[in-house]
């Protein structure tokens, strides 16, 4: 309801965003209405336990992984909180035989490479009709290869870095795993030389249904 005080526990990877919003709200809201509690990765669970166990907190909203969502669901049971959970998925983009491939590729690029593929609404996989898969892959790879890696404020940059080096390593390992199961890298697939947690825009086809990629 409007006017209820809020406690925000931002992601340990991006705490400054929530703190910036709190600074903008400073002086506009009464003291104690908007409260930001950053926490390191090591302290995220203890902070979560306090929020879940408190009888003063009546509702909890969370966006993140399914594993953490299940933990919060169970932890909030003792205080019977209202819960709003937006959890991980594996949503496909489906390309039918009758699809306009130029439109399909444009949609695929907008979905998959938005914020470096790090948003919760990105398509996680592409299911393409066998009659058009070759043309679709060719067009998609051409668009992906044209993306320029670099600083987000530099002119011409099409895609920036991943959140950290661990994410880059994870991408490398997932691509290697897919190759070992018979997949083919059409473009990208590597960390480029130089500093930063960059990873080449990558298109992989014929990925096994049980692949971690």
What is each model feature region?
Residues 1-32, 80, 102:
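Conserved small-residue-rich beta-alpha loop and adjacent elements
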Residues 9-11, 39, 97:
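Cofactor-binding loop segments of dinucleotide-utilizing enzymes, especially the Rossmann-like FAD-
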Residues 14-15, 41-42, 193:
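Short, small-residue-enriched loops and turns at beta-alpha junctions
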Residues 16-20, 46, 71, 135-136:
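Phosphate- and divalent-cation-binding pockets in alpha/beta enzyme and binding domains
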Residues 17, 51, 75:
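Hydrophobic/aromatic ligand-binding patch that stacks against planar heteroaromatic rings
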Residues 24, 28-29, 59, 65-212:
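ALDH superfamily catalytic-core signature
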Residues 36-61:
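A structured beta-alpha segment of the ubiquitous adenosine-cofactor-binding alpha/beta core
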């Amino acid at each position: 309801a409007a006017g209820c005080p809020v406690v925000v526990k931002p992601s340990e990877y991006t705490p400054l965003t929530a703190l910036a919003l709190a600074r903008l709200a400073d002086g506009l809201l009464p003291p104690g209405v908007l409260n930001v509690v950053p926490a390191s990765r090591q302290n995220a669970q203890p902070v979560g336990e306090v929020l879940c166990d408190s009888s003063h907190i009546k509702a909890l909203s969370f966006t993140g992984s399914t594993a953490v969502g299940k933990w919060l669901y169970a932890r909030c049971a003792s205080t019977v909180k209202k819960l709003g959970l937006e959890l991980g998925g594996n949503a496909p983009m489906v390309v039918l035989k009758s699809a306009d491939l130029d439109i399909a590729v444009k949609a695929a690029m907008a979905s998959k490479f938005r914020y470096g593929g790090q948003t919760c609404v990105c398509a996680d996989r592409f299911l393409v009709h066998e009659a058009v898969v070759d043309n679709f892959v060719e067009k998609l790879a051409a668009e992906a290869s044209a993306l320029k890696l670099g600083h987000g404020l530099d002119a011409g940059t099409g895609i920036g870095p991943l959140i950290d080096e661990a994410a880059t390593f994870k991408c490398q390992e997932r691509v290697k795993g897919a190759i070992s199961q018979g997949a083919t890298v059409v473009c990208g697939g590597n960390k480029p030389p130089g500093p930063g947690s960059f990873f080449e825009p990558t298109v992989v086809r014929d990925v096994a249904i049980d692949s971690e990629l």
